[in-house]
Each structure stands twice: as C-alpha cells, then as structure tokens.
Amino acid sequence: MQGASSTVKSTAAGPCLALHPNPLSATARALVPDFELPDLSGKKVSLRSMRGRPVLVSFFATWCPPCVEEAPSLEALAGHLGDKATVAIVSVDEDRNALKKYFIQGSRAIVLRDESQKVSASFGTFKFPESFLIDPAGKIRYAFINKRDWSVAEAAACIEGLR
C-alpha cells in the first residue's frame, strides 16, 4: 500500500483501500438484486447461490483490451481464494465462442454470460472492466472501475476481510 499511512494500513478496510475503490452512492450499498445467468456450459447460476461468502463480480468483454489484461489476475485471485469467496466474471459478449478463447470450462472463476446486458445494466455498468465486491449479506461494499491487478496480496486480504 504505497503512500497509505500506517493508520490506514492497520484498519480492516486498509487492504481494500489499497486497491483504490471508486466512491459508492448510498443506494449502491443496498442489497444487490438476485440474477441468474448461464455459465460457459449453459448451466444457470444465480447470485443467490453465492451468498454467505464474499463475491467479486467483474464485468468483462473480449473486445475490451483492459478486460483481457485483467482476466489472468482474476483467475489467480479465484485460485488463491478457493472456497473462501467467489470470483464471478460476467461477460457481455454475444459470441460465446469468443469468450471460450479466454476461459476454459473448469475455470477457477465462475464465468457467466450476460449477452442481453440486463445484469450489467442493473449494476449501472457502462465502462469495462468494472468490478463490485459484495459482502456475504449481499450488499455492495466496494466498486472498482477500470483494470486492477487482482493478484496482489491486498486483493485477497480485502475480500477475505469481508468474511
């Protein structure tokens, strides 16, 4: 956490603040509405099924160079977190085959398809990549617009701190 004071570093939010989250409005902190999207195999996955542990929802597109650059660090984070939290990558791509070039079945992150972009619209997402950290109760705690390196230690500490 370069540039952060030792007081900030020692707070529970310190690791999250090191990732430079974007401000949230009061309404954004409300309970996230449930959604259900197909994964790469076509199986429907709901946000409700992920509740009870932290969830990082990251909106992605194959035509977005920063998204493609960010994807390996999301995979690494998902592998590091294991069952402690969920990393859900939500793709707005219409072409499932394009998406399969970047993620294989059995990916450590859950890869979901939002071809209609209804879920991304419900989050107010219009820039990619954009990620939201949701606590176990289903409330958005942090929003991150633009690419991040999710493989840094602060990312795992931030998410694990919400358990």
Where on the chain are the PLM-derived regions?
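N-proximal helix/coil linker or "cap" segments that precede and/or mark the start of modular domains
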Residues: 2-34
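Thiol-/selenol-based redox modules, centered on thioredoxin-like
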Residues: 18, 133-163
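A short beta-strand-turn-helix
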Residues: 26-29, 34-55
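Conserved redox-active cysteine motifs that mediate thiol-disulfide chemistry
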Residues: 51, 59-76
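Hydrophobic beta-strand anchors of alpha/beta hydrolase catalytic cores
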Residues: 56-57, 87
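Active-site loop/turn elements of alpha/beta-hydrolase fold enzymes
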Residues: 61, 92-94
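Short, internal strand/loop/helix patches
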Residues: 88, 103-137
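Acidic helix N-cap motif at the loop->helix transition within catalytic regions
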Residues: 96-100
